[in-house]
């Protein structure tokens, strides 16, 4: 189980600094497949736990993620990982997560992710299959993957992992060292909500400054 060292109040948000996370949580796991952006050797990893039906998650996608990509992810400083946190056990949120995973099985996870969070989106079984067609996916394989609800266990595993970090809503974020993970000197930072870019930048810059050789 995790140990929180302290709560830090900043001008923008309250943060929990986490010395050690759940034992089975890593910066990137084998089940992340194509749900990772950025360089493998980026010193920091930012994990998002999210639901495609969550309004605040969409706010992060539209307003904050593009700035993080330009400033930290594309420059090799941060690796970004998307993990699922469906807020219900069934329904459109779960179906959307399955659709994205099925697209990921054909190498188009981020294309589907962006479509699901995009303008004019519809979230229902028919729209997921239409999106798959427009993305050029193998329709037979996608339909079979979606109808069989493949990847469900991995999706709910992500949610259980988020709960063990202390999250019980979306979105939630964990910022941590990519290789070493949380340590006493450089604890992980739990960011509970869709805060503005400046809040993420403050924590990323602070953690980067603590790394060896910085």
Segments from the language model and where they lie:
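Acidic/histidine-rich, surface-exposed loop or edge segments in extracytoplasmic proteins
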Residues: 47-52, 185
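Bacterial N-terminal signal peptides that target proteins for export
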Residues: 1-12
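Structural alpha/beta surface segment adjacent to cysteine/selenocysteine redox centers
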Residues: 42, 50-133, 138, 206-211
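C-terminal cap of thioredoxin/glutaredoxin-like
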Residues: 5, 63, 130-214
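Boundary at the C-terminal end of the N-terminal hydrophobic targeting segment
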Residues: 20-30
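Bacterial N-terminal signal peptides
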Residues: 10-21
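A short beta-strand-turn-helix
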Residues: 28-44, 72
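Soluble periplasmic/extracytoplasmic beta-strand elements of cell-envelope proteins
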Residues: 45-48, 79-82, 172-174, 190
């Amino acid at each position: 189980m995790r140990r929180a060292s302290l709560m830090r109040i900043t001008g923008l948000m309250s943060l929990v600094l986490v010395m050690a996370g759940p034992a089975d949580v890593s910066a990137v796991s084998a089940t992340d497949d194509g749900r990772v952006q950025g360089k493998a050797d980026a010193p920091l990893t930012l994990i998002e736990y999210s639901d495609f039906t969550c309004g605040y998650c969409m706010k992060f996608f539209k307003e904050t993620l593009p700035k993080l990509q330009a400033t930290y992810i594309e420059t090799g400083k941060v690796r970004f990982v998307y993990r699922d946190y469906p807020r219900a056990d069934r329904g459109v949120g779960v179906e959307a997560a399955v659709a994205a995973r099925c697209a990921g099985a054909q190498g188009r996870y981020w294309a589907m992710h962006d479509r699901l969070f995009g303008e004019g989106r519809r979230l229902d079984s028919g729209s997921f299959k239409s999106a798959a067609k427009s993305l050029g996916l193998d329709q037979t394989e996608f339909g079979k993957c979606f109808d069989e609800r493949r990847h469900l266990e991995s999706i709910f595993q992500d949610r259980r992992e988020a709960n063990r970090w202390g999250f019980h809503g979306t979105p939630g974020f964990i910022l941590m060292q990519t290789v070493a993970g949380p340590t006493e000197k450089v604890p992980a930072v739990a960011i509970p909500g869709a805060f503005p870019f400046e809040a993420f930048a403050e924590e990323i810059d602070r953690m980067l400054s603590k790394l060896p050789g910085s």
